[in-house]
């Protein structure tokens, strides 16, 4: 499956999360959704990156911030969250003129560490995997943040709601 876009949603009132999850599950463009903890509350994998999808998401009740990332290049896609190990969505701001070099360096990381990797209008999107939160932190701090051209990395831990 080719990904059309990734979307990251932040709600001012977390009471709006359950209605938002129900609403996004009805979207025909939705491939997968994840509850996350960090800068956002929900991460979505979408089959379409068009303006109509973005506009539909913008109408969700209580939505305060939307990072909508249409995919221009997908180097790695598709993964399934399991109860073990730990996963985090990474959204990265990258200098446009250094994007190719950054993406090549990220693609050189083992697939076991970066399960998803895509570039788009919002920079780069990835899913990091590790045995612990600390292992993912070390990966980001030692191998991703220092890359020339990476301006900012935001980390959002994937929450397995079946474990709550």
Predicted regions and their residues:
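A compositional/biophysical signature of low hydrophobicity enriched in polar/charged and small residues
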Residues: 1-164
């Amino acid at each position: 499956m080719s990904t059309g876009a990734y979307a990251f949603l932040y709600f001012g009132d977390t009471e709006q999360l359950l209605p938002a999850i129900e609403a996004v599950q009805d979207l025909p463009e939705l491939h997968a959704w994840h509850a996350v903890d960090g800068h956002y509350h929900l991460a979505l994998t979408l089959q379409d990156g068009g303006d109509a999808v973005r506009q539909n998401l913008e109408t969700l009740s209580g939505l305060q911030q939307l990072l909508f990332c249409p995919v221009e290049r997908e180097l790695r896609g598709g993964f399934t969250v399991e109860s073990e190990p730990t996963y985090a969505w990474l959204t990265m701001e990258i200098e446009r003129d250094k994007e190719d070099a950054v993406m090549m360096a990220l693609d050189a990381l083992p697939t076991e560490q970066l399960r998803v990797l895509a570039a788009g209008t919002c920079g780069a999107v990835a899913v990091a995997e590790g045995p612990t939160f600390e292992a993912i932190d070390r990966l980001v701090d030692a191998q991703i943040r220092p890359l020339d051209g990476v301006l900012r990395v935001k980390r959002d831990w994937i929450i397995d709601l079946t474990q709550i």
